[in-house]
């Protein structure tokens, strides 16, 4: 496979906002053709416009919890661009701030469906495309979280799914070796996004106190993902932890 990003095709899930939008724009600026996946068509179009528009950007509204829609996403990517070289497997939701004893089954399932099942379905779609195409191979980057290592209070569904993503990453990395498919994970702490905005106003700490936390410019995340993606397939960033330097992560769990 060519190492030139101008010949590569990326699929980005959760591309309508936050980390997904920032990474989709950065990949497009680096020369990738980018397929933008997310639930809201209007948000995907906003991302496409912010990335410069044009024929090398494809908005593909997708609910990652629905197998048929994920199949359609990768079919659209292949029909438009002929291959898939990169999946940034980013779509995710949280249900933080709910006491463990107050969690409902529906809330638990909604987080698991997006953060774990959706990530599996998208990784499988990319894996199948990468295995079958010529030249063979590609790269999958799963968006984990520092919650894959240490929980926050009242975050059981999110924390459990992010721990599970680490296992998924390891399994894909192992199973992909024979097909030149690399899989890595980026664990991000406190990037400035709409989802994480509450961090600046104060969130519950392990000791029960409420405190604001240091934040990280989402552009740093986008740069890290582009770096991981740009490596030749003989090299892989298996796990990267990228966090705000002064956030309370080390020592919290």
Which residues does each PLM region occupy?
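Substrate-binding pocket helix/loop in short-chain dehydrogenase/reductase
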Residues: 98-100, 107-109
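The beta1-alpha1 cofactor-binding region of Rossmann-like NAD(H)/NADP(H)-dependent oxidoreductases
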Residues: 61-73, 105
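Active-site helix of classical SDR
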Residues: 123, 161
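Residue(s) in the substrate-gating loop at a strand-loop-helix junction
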Residues: 145
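C-terminal helical subdomain
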Residues: 185-186, 204-250
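Conserved glycine-rich cofactor-binding loop
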Residues: 16-18
């Amino acid at each position: 496979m060519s190492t030139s990003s101008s010949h590569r095709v990326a699929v980005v899930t959760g591309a309508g906002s936050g980390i997904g939008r920032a990474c989709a724009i950065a990949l497009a600026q680096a020369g990738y053709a980018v397929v933008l996946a997310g639930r809201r068509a209007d948000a995907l179009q906003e991302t496409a416009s912010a990335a410069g528009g044009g024929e090398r950007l494809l908005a593909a509204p997708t609910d990652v919890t629905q197998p048929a829609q994920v199949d359609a996403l990768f079919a659209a990517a292949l029909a438009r661009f002929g291959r898939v070289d990169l999946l940034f497997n980013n779509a995710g939701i949280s249900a933080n701030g709910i006491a463990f004893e107050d969690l409902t089954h529906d809330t638990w399932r909604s987080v698991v469906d997006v953060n774990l099942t959706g990530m599996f379905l998208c990784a499988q779609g990319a894996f199948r495309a990468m295995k079958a195409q010529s030249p063979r191979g590609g790269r999958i980057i799963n968006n984990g979280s520092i919650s894959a290592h240490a929980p926050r209070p009242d975050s059981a569904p999110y924390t459990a799914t992010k721990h599970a993503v680490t296992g998924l990453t390891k399994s894909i990395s192992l199973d992909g070796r024979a097909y030149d498919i690399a899989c890595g994970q980026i664990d991000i702490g406190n990037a400035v996004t709409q989802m994480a905005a509450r961090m600046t106003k104060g969130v519950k700490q392990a000791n029960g106190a409420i405190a604001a936390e240091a934040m990280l410019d989402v552009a740093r995340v986008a740069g890290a993902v582009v770096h991981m993606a740009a490596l030749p397939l003989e090299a892989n960033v298996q796990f990267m932890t990228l966090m705000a330097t002064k956030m309370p992560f080390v020592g919290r769990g």
